Regions:
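Short hydrophobic/aromatic segments of transmembrane alpha-helices and their interfaces
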Residues: 12-14, 76-77, 88-89, 109-112, ...
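N-terminal juxtamembrane segment and adjoining first transmembrane helix
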Residues: 1-82, 191
Length: 197
């Protein structure tokens, strides 16, 4: 199978689904950790602007991750659709939590870097730049909305721009690593066939 051809549903082996399951466990742990830190620490800036929205977004993220643990076991819906829904939900929930925490100074925007890298590697790089563009649009919209709604908020478009560039850099790196991995895997299969015959 050439590197540029599409992957059919039958090509998604247990390894793909196991990677998606571990990625979802990471998502569950991050969401749970954010909730625990926001409940236990009175010094955390998490939810500093709108704590109730932060809690709802965090609980929604954890529940959504828990639901997908079951759906991954059932393998419903398909692999690409599950991955896309999970990453887009990460972007949506983290954007809400970022807004509820007072914007970019909370540091929550960096969490999407890990999510984008993981998704890029799991998808074998095919959707990585798409996810980075969605995250960038969401970040810029969140920053603009924060400027309009939070009193005395200083827009940090330069920081948002740098973080957006980091999103694309991580997505591109994941894309390149995934292509390299696929090429190595294909070469190993060819050499395995050569040794057998």
């Amino acid at each position: 199978m050439p590197l540029e051809s599409g992957i059919t549903a039958a090509d998604y082996t247990d390894q793909y689904w196991r990677s998606l399951y571990y990625f979802n466990c990471f998502r569950f742990a991050i969401g749970s950790g954010l909730l625990i830190v926001s409940w236990q620490s009175e010094f955390a800036s998490l939810g500093s602007y709108h704590y109730q929205l932060f809690l709802y977004a965090g609980i929604g993220h954890v529940l959504f991750s828990g639901l997908f643990m079951l759906l991954i076991r059932l393998r419903l819906p398909g692999f690409n659709r599950q991955l896309a829904i999970q990453v887009i939900s990460d972007i949506a929930f983290f954007s809400l939590m970022l807004y509820a925490s007072g914007g970019l100074q909370s540091g929550l925007g960096v969490l999407l870097l890990v999510s984008l890298a993981g998704a890029g590697l799991i998808s074998r790089g095919r959707l990585a730049l798409f996810f980075a563009s969605i995250a960038t649009i969401s970040l810029l919209l969140q920053e603009t909305y924060s400027l309009w709604t939070i009193d005395h908020y200083a827009a940090q478009y330069s920081q948002a721009g740098l973080l957006s560039m980091a999103y694309f850099a991580v997505a591109w790196l994941a894309h390149r690593l995934a292509k390299y991995t696929l090429a190595s895997e294909q070469l190993a299969k060819e050499r395995g066939i050569d040794y057998c015959c």
